[in-house]
Amino acid sequence: MKKFMYQLAILIAPFAFAMCSENGNIPVESNWELEYIYSNGSEMAPPEEHNATIAFLNDSQIAGDTGCNRFFGNFTATDNSLEFNNVGSTRMMCPQMQFENAFMSTIENTASYNISKDQLVLKDSLGNIIALLKKIEPVAQEN
C-alpha cells in the first residue's frame, strides 16, 4: 500500500505544481465573457450581439475578442494580483468603438482579481471593481 501511495504521489506532484505555479489561481484554459464594465461610477454592459471575451491560455498567454477586434498578450497572476502585458490587437473600425476602448482600458488597468464560482471580478490598483465576467465554454475559432 505504501508503494502504491508513493507512486501515486510521484504521478500527481508535477500536475499539482504546474497548476499553482506562476499563474496563481487563474485557471488556465478557461474562457470568460464580459458582463459589465464599471467606469467613472457607471456600469456599462456590452452592446447587444457584442460578445467580449477573454481566454487564459497555457504559457501565461491570453486571447480575446472585443466584439469587433481580437486581442492577445500575456498575463501574470500571483495570489490575487493580475497583470496583463504585451497586449496587442487587430485594428478594425466598428460602430461600437467606445465600448471596445473602455474594455481595452479595463484590461490595461487590471491589478487584481477574484473568482467566485463562475464569476471573475477584475479590480484596479485601488481595489475598485472594474469588470465582471462569467465563465463560458470555449468558443470554436473560425479559420
Where are these regions (language model features)?
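Bacterial N-terminal signal peptides that target proteins for export
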Residues: 1-8
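Lipid interaction determinants
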Residues: 6, 19-143
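Bacterial N-terminal signal peptides
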Residues: 8-16
